[in-house]
Amino acid sequence: CQQWERADKKDHRLYAFALDEGRLYEASYKTLIAHEDKLNPGAFIASLSIPWGESKGDDDLGGYHLVWPRDMVNTATGLLAAGNSETPLRALMFLAAAQKADGGFYQNFWINGDPYWTGIQLDEVSFPVMLAWRLKRAGGLQGFDPYSMTMSAVAYLMLNGPITQQERWEEASGFSPSTLAANIAALTCAASFAAQAGDKVSAELIQDYADYLKCHLEQWTVTTRGELLPGVPEYFVRINPVKNVNAVEGLNAAELFINNRPASKQQIFEARNIVDAGFLELVRYGVYPADSALIRNSLKVVDAVLKVDTPKGPCWRRYNHDGYGQKADGGPFDGTGVGRAWPLLTGERGHYELAAGNDVTAYIKALEHFVSRGGTLPEQVWDTDDIPAAHLYKGGTTGAARPLAWAHAEYIKLLRSAADGRVFDQIPEVVNRYINAPQLCKLIEIWHMQWQTPKVRPNYTLRIIAGESFHLVLSRDAWQNSDDFPSKGTGIGVHYVDIPIGQATPGAQLLFTFHWIERNVWEGKNFTVKIAE
């Protein structure tokens, strides 16, 4: 009895902000607790369900019975919002143990830490860093030191970004607004960690990289030729698919392949005309203000393309032309289907509206109405005309995952945000740097093996970073002459050289190669960065 009472201890203030007498709050809290494995403390799976389980065979072992770092940290943060810091600490410790040697995290894994899918999602590297920061700020670390985990994670971000192999919908690679939002926030948290530890060099390097992402964000993820809403050509896209690290393709001309669509239907679309609401994460963490004209214009497009008004309240689809969901005839998703509306996106929109100073009652009420008969929130709801024979009703559950822990966490965080009068996930250090006292962009371009930026402008600094010490041998005149630059080390294992470009002639080339000091080997090939016009 005492053990259950400890697990059920939560912030009773939040009941006052529920509109259903606290039923969903109570159910959400217990649902999140139930998703922790009992033999592997801190291991939270995404859902106790198997989506469209009635159509699945024994060969589909994973289902949603896996740990996704993104879903898990959202679960832990939902519990933290409810006043529970002990369970989120177990989650952080589990993630620290599951972290890869290179600082990254697997896309998902079994509760014992063994990987299942091995894709790279850079937001999933960022989320554990933000959880560590939140627990530290809340005084909930209880002697556990996440510093090594945090620094390894941000070193991984710096050496493997800014292109993510997969974004939060796990289907596309490129520049993702939601991924970059998480990266910027996590890097800023880590810079704060390093500064507090007295490592000013690492703190500055980490923050410089966060600033670099922020200063390039619109160049990478905003179209100026969108066609989805007349009169609004400029908005954030879902993702800018980049095929070649050596040559960033212009977003306005890029094409995006969309998964889960039948071969008989169009599968390749112009990236500028595919949107989701992932850019709202920029407001959630404090990278952009809620009243940004670009954010507001992007919302106009999202509402015109993705919003669904159901009898139970407003809901949003993930992105246009999504194929992950119940089929049009009501049949189960079997590799193809139609993406339906996701209640967790109603919660995300509620957080934006709160940040904008608006009433969030409609979003709290909608989430409470989206619950199933068993009191749980689904991943998706039916978003078109009723099909009674298939038990599908507009605003009602589908065969998608139910419960979805992430959706329950989003509801709890929305209650907490309403109680506090500010977004619970907002990070003060991020707000201070990018909203309250915005910094001028440094004239810096970053190059590393996974991000071989092709150009640098006159009067900029080209910063070359690597995960080991090196000598950079560089020529500005086609190897008639060369200079040798030893790298500078940092406390996070990232080494770097800064090359001032000065008044270089546009069109000129920088040629360089590496001698790796510890291994005493030459890279064996040259690299080129051109001086931009």
Language model features with spans:
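Glycan-association/targeting regions that enable binding to alpha-glucans and other polysaccharides
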Residues: 426-533
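C-terminal capping/lid segments that line or modulate ligand- or cofactor-binding pockets
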Residues: 75, 118-135, 254-256, 269-289, ...
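Structural helix-adjacent loops and short alpha-helical linkers that scaffold large soluble proteins
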Residues: 13-22, 39-42, 79-92, 134-151, ...
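Aromatic-rich carbohydrate-recognition surfaces in CAZymes
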Residues: 62-163, 176-180, 184-190, 408, ...
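Acidic/polar, glycine-enriched structural segments that form the non-catalytic walls/loops
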Residues: 1-63, 426
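Acidic/His metal-coordination segments adjacent to aromatic residues that form catalytic metal sites
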Residues: 51-61, 105-120, 158-175, 256-264, ...
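Extended ligand-binding clefts on enzyme/binding-domain cores
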Residues: 9, 15-24, 121-122, 178, ...
